[in-house]
From Swiss-Prot:
Reaction it catalyzes: FMNH2 + NAD(+) = FMN + NADH + 2 H(+)
Family according to the record: Belongs to the non-flavoprotein flavin reductase family. RutF subfamily.
Gene Ontology terms describing biological process: nitrogen utilization; uracil catabolic process
Organism expressing this protein natively: Escherichia coli O45:K1 (strain S88 / ExPEC)
Kinase is among the record's keywords: no
Assigned EC number: 1.5.1.42
Pfam families: Flavin_Reduct (PF01613)
Name of the protein: FMN reductase (NADH) RutF
Domain of life, source organism: Bacteria
GO molecular function, one term: FMN reductase [NAD(P)H] activity
Keyword Oxidoreductase: yes
Enzyme class of the recorded protein, top EC level: oxidoreductase
InterPro entries documented for this protein: Flavin_Rdtase-like_dom, NADH-dep_flavin_reductase, RutF, Split_barrel_FMN-bd
Function: Catalyzes the reduction of FMN to FMNH2 which is used to reduce pyrimidine by RutA via the Rut pathway.
């Protein structure tokens, strides 16, 4: 069997552009958030997406206990917020850097996100170092901004919606 080494895999994955998201939760275990690009649609019946979370991450116990989350897809210009949630900054400072609403699940919903998916975690599958969180979508909130944000080749890139 041919096994691909970790660096080759990471280099190859940098060729796959992905939306930049801040994943948030709030509940009995507290409030937490992190930046993620490992997010994708699973099915539209019922509306479900998945989020991958490293079990070694400091936020893992909070998400594991709360069992709710909000996927906040960032707009162009929100790179500093992505960096803040992707680092070692204390949670209270992360959340103080933006305006939030409370979603139907009680999770923080970023007011200026391109789109927010408010979810309950319906299933968890462990693979290697990560848990794959299957998330049943309970509510969606869209913002009118025409600019998206993607992570490609280890850097941010702005996308603009085509004119109709």
């Amino acid at each position: 069997m041919n096994i691909v080494d970790q660096q080759t895999f990471r280099d190859a994955m940098s060729c796959m552009g992905a939306a930049v998201n801040i994943i948030t939760t709030d509940g009995p275990a507290g409030r937490a958030g992190f930046t993620a690009s490992a997010v994708c649609s699973v099915t539209d019946t019922p509306p479900t997406l998945l989020v991958c979370l490293n079990r070694g991450a400091s936020v893992w116990p909070v998400f594991n206990e709360n069992r709710t989350l909000c996927v906040n897809t960032l707009s162009a210009g929100q790179e500093p917020l992505s960096n803040l949630f992707g680092g070692k900054t204390p949670m209270e400072l992360r959340f103080a850097a933006a305006r939030w609403q409370t979603g139907v699940t009680g999770c923080p919903q970023l007011e200026e996100a391109l789109v927010s998916f408010d979810c309950r975690i319906s299933q968890v599958v462990s693979v290697g170092t990560h848990d794959i969180l299957f998330c049943a979508i309970e509510a969606i909130h869209r913002h009118a901004t025409p600019y998206g944000l993607v992570w490609f080749d280890r850097s941010y890139h702005a996308l603009m919606r085509p004119a109709c």
